[in-house]
Amino acid sequence: MYHFVYETTNLINGKKYIGKHSTDDLNDGYLGSGKAIQQAIKKYGENNFSRTILKEFKTSEEAYMYEEEIITPELIKSKNYYNMKPGGIGGIVMTTDVIAKMKESSAKRFENSPGTVLGKTCYTNGTKNIFIKPGELVPEGFVKGMVHPNRKSRKGCKVKPTTTGTFWVNNGAINKLIQPDGIIPDGFIKGRLMKRDSKGKFSKA
């Protein structure tokens, strides 16, 4: 399952919508469920919208929390966005109590996950993961992140190892994956471009 925060853009007027989505298929064609964005899609047609993945997460809770951070009151008031309320999920407000419960759930899940220890950072050499305490020496050949060698795709094929903390950038035509401490190249901005095919599905640009 993929969990991410995305940005949908109206290619006609440039207006945008930010939301969170969880899916087994990155090319599912999902553009958003908010009232305003749905009305816009109905008016302009799906082919006049594009979706960019802003950031990927390991859990749905983490994605919700990031979404809550970036959908600010200023953004909601802006005429450049379709978002109507904090949270961005169909205009539903996430209360303080709900956010607290999600944080607690996320913390427990992390604490109880096999091979993980709170307070430590995961490093990988591409085949093996180790957890290092703050201040401890990182072995040669290891970099910050986690590899998932046994992860399966929907078709049962192995997925290329992924590294936690990396992020996508694009220059309007090309996508690049940047390491956690990497520098964004000139002319590139954060986000991953996704193109829509003739069937309405998204594919990598």
Curated annotation (Swiss-Prot):
Its cofactor is Mg(2+). Residues 1-84 form the GIY-YIG domain. Keywords: Endonuclease, Hydrolase, Magnesium, Nuclease. Its EC number is 3.1.-.-. GO terms for molecular function: endonuclease activity. PROSITE patterns: GIY_YIG. It is an enzyme of class 3 (hydrolase). InterPro entries: GIY-YIG_endonuc, GIY-YIG_endonuc_sf, SegE-like_GIY-YIG. It comes from the Viruses. It holds the Pfam family SegE_GIY-YIG. To endonucleases of group I introns of fungi and phage. Probably involved in the movement of the endonuclease-encoding DNA. This is Putative endonuclease segE.
